[in-house]
Amino acid sequence: MVQESRPGSVRSYSVGYQARSRSSSQRRHSLTRQRSSQRLIRTISIESDVSNITDDDDLRAVNEGVAGVQLDVSETANKGPRRASATDVTDSLGSTSSEYIEIPFVKETLDASLPSDYLKQDILNLIQSLKISKWYNNKKIQPVAQDMNLVKISGAMTNAIFKVEYPKLPSLLLRIYGPNIDNIIDREYELQILARLSLKNIGPSLYGCFVNGRFEQFLENSKTLTKDDIRNWKNSQRIARRMKELHVGVPLLSSERKNGSACWQKINQWLRTIEKVDQWVGDPKNIENSLLCENWSKFMDIVDRYHKWLISQEQGIEQVNKNLIFCHNDAQYGNLLFTAPVMNTPSLYTAPSSTSLTSQSSSLFPSSSNVIVDDIINPPKQEQSQDSKLVVIDFEYAGANPAAYDLANHLSEWMYDYNNAKAPHQCHADRYPDKEQVLNFLYSYVSHLRGGAKEPIDEEVQRLYKSIIQWRPTVQLFWSLWAILQSGKLEKKEASTAITREEIGPNGKKYIIKTEPESPEEDFVENDDEPEAGVSIDTFDYMAYGRDKIAVFWGDLIGLGIITEEECKNFSSFKFLDTSYL
């Protein structure tokens, strides 16, 4: 607790330290201080699958093939990540890694629950320590915290994300990792993915990292897509083409293909994590309320039954691994941006006109739809040339998966309105795309970058349509388990050891500070300069979100004939989508 001492008023703030962090359990030593942390360089190898932090006198790690951190002694590193030569790094087995990037790093943390003036000063200190270009050592502009503007960006459910603004300086995107993520996101793997994407000029530039977050390029004048934008007939085609480009444009590592689908790796990991919390798993009320099942044992049995069924539909695990590609795995509309206005695109979804001519090509569309398939698979050059204006961001969940999983995830996001002020967690099953909308999306996806494919396009679309329905329950299961972990309900309460002290704030006022551990509910207290609308990591109802997700999971399993209604106790709570194949 912070009490601001000034005549006639006392202001209190909640100030805490993370009881658990990825590096160690430690208290925040103080509030804001004018300090400059040692700037290190994190070297991320593309092929070695490792990235460790080393001391500045341990530079031999690079020569031994460990992607490590070096003391920054070069002025050439001031502009953020740089690409290094192929001969500089070798992996632990002695083979040469082909490429790697170097990213500035400081061993500091940011506490998003700090009062605004403290948080701004800490952010500015980090920017200076990381030597972010234009902000650091600028002879014309010397940034001061009180002139900085923080805008919290809505729609983020894993992190606290801010736009950092300053007059006449390029804005930055600040990402502060959320609580309860230790078992959710592998940050080392995420950085390796960002390195791979950077080498292919995909995604925003990464300017620097700290212990619990990072700074990225802010895409100025960009517009985040909305729930209505993704339903737009032409936008949906464009999203499909861009997803296809990502799927074929980023090769998998051999280790990724060997490890199998990333979604089931995570699902199995999260099931083990939840199962270890005996008190939670052992209470049937938790399982019934959160997973809509009688008990944990029955839930695990049905998940195993579905997984075995899914693998059999794919002709075995070897075939599943063979078909893996690089996937984003979280292509919800909040992660899709237009970097510039797209010409001649309606703002809302409009079905094809009934006066349209019938396509001369074969088609899986109902004859009554009057859709011209040729217009989908052969878009005008002017239309396709604007695809580059659509970019996908936030690769936290990216990894190897079947295309059907990634596409099913995107189509499932049509059911959500994260900017709904009352219930951003709610799943609206009636908003799942209908057959025409799915076919519009799939014809665009399959026809783009098709190369010399021998399979007739209708057959490929039909096969993918079926596979999406079969992988759709995996999507719902994944995010349901994610929600349970993200909610913090499994976290054990730790004893509070409060520390009280006095400090002088950046504005010269005297503060009495009581520092104590944070509970999940206390993390990331709102303190930005501008009001926030829509979903927020602070207020999002993760458990209700997960319950709606698992309701779709059960509905799909019944529709696919994997389980029966008689096996289910909470049948009335289930949500049902169309599970019929073409």
Swiss-Prot record:
Pathway: Phospholipid metabolism; phosphatidylcholine biosynthesis; phosphocholine from choline: step 1/1. One of its GO terms (biological process) is phosphatidylethanolamine biosynthetic process. PANTHER family: CHOLINE/ETHANOALAMINE KINASE, RE24176P. Optimum temperature is 30 degrees Celsius. CDD domains: ETNK_euk (cd05157). This is Choline kinase. Gene3D superfamilies: 3.90.1200.10, Phosphorylase Kinase, domain 1. Catalyzes the committed step in the synthesis of phosphatidylcholine by the CDP-choline pathway. Also exhibits ethanolamine kinase activity but it is a poor substrate at 14% efficiency compared with choline. The keyword Endoplasmic reticulum does not apply. The modification Phosphothreonine is found at T54. Belongs to the choline/ethanolamine kinase family. It comes from the Eukaryota. GO terms for cellular component: cytoplasm. Optimum pH is 9.5-12. It is found in: Cytoplasm. Residues 1-36 are annotated as: Disordered. Pfam families: Choline_kin_N, Choline_kinase. Monomer. Interacts with NAP1. Its main location: cytoplasm. Its cofactor is Mg(2+). The modification Phosphoserine is found at S30, S48, S51, S85. Transmembrane segments: none annotated. Present with 3930 molecules/cell in log phase SD medium.
